[in-house]
Amino acid sequence: MEKTTPTQYDVKVQYNNSILNYAIDHSDQLTDIQKELIQFTKENIERHIMLTQAEQCSFFKLLIQVLNAKKTIDIGVFTGLSSLTAALAMGDEGRVVACDVSTDYTQHALKFWAKAGVDHKINLKIQPASKTLQELIDQGEENTYDFVFIDADKTGYDTYYELSLKLIRKGGIIAIDNVLQHGRVADPNANVEPNLVAIRALNDKILADKRVTKTMLPIADGITLVTKIN
């Protein structure tokens, strides 16, 4: 009998804020400093929508600890929640290379990292992430990183992905954020603009990429996880 592949899947649960908060409440709780950072960002930063979601934080904590990660990279720091999450998830020997191009938001991140007592774990690099990643490669750090989180300028994602693949070890994980673009990736009538074009292209590229095992999860605005095979 010829095998047929399903082409249409159904949503099992229609998510809303009540369900989201129930799930968060039944996960490892954020620390007081993480909650304070989130509240500060929502109250003081106009573009607070860029903040990593709470459910992502608990998810990344679990991934980092399952990997027994010692070396991570955070591409796109904003006010520092994702870097803080990684630093808290690792032991004292853990290190985070935090990549951003501006101090406008990272100046706040530095304060929260210090308050949490993890600032010594985080190396903030204020320059294009592609430059930082290439410097790490040039310093002989290929195949040594355990976890990379990409959440920065969408048109740069392909470059960050390729450089991260060189830096990640076999079995390490790259997490790529905003791969659903608020559902626009699946909407044929969506306004085509550079961010959407870049994300659609990367999604298709990763799907066909035989260097990695991959899964796309509808968490927050969509997260793709890839792990390097070779």
Curated annotation (Swiss-Prot):
One Pfam short name: Methyltransf_3
Gene Ontology MF term list: caffeoyl-CoA O-methyltransferase activity; metal ion binding; S-adenosylmethionine-dependent methyltransferase activity
GO biological process, one term: methylation
Assigned keywords, A-Z: Metal-binding, Methyltransferase, S-adenosyl-L-methionine, Transferase
UniProt cross-references to PROSITE patterns, sorted A to Z: SAM_OMT_I (PS51682)
Its EC number(s): 2.1.1.104
Catalysed conversion reaction: (E)-caffeoyl-CoA + S-adenosyl-L-methionine = (E)-feruloyl-CoA + S-adenosyl-L-homocysteine + H(+)
Record bears the keyword DNA damage: no
Highest taxon in the source lineage: Eukaryota
Binding residue positions for S-adenosyl-L-methionine: T52, D74, G76, V77, S82, D100, A129, D151, D153, Y160
Record: residues binding a divalent metal cation: D151, D177, N178
Family statement: Belongs to the class I-like SAM-binding methyltransferase superfamily. Cation-dependent O-methyltransferase family. CCoAMT subfamily.
Alphabetized PANTHER family for the sequence: CAFFEOYL-COA O-METHYLTRANSFERASE 1-RELATED, O-METHYLTRANSFERASE-RELATED
Protein's UniProt name: Probable caffeoyl-CoA O-methyltransferase 1
